């Protein structure tokens, strides 16, 4: 009976550590997202959602790269906690598809149909291109000797 209680306690501990890792990754990603948006607005202005485009493209690259480099055939071993910290926590906190949707709606409400269409088109193509690029780069690294 004591062994069963110990195993149940260990399972709860493991879950708490995993949730903590995801939460910490989300905090770090969220802070970097906010800083990126502020920086993009300062550099490029506020007429187009540059910050959101940047974080979603960068996050797509990171998740494509990390999922491949740390996957079953990857060169880097990463346990579940680390993978969840990076992919669910950090990338989830860093990217912001809800803000993308809101910014697109605001462009439409301002009757900026070309801007909204450009935001949607460029974003989707860039996200897919970035995740593909990250995956491709990590796949090549995985095949290197050594």
Q: Model regions: which residues?
A:
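Membrane-interface helix-loop junctions in multi-pass transporters/channels
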Residues: 1-146
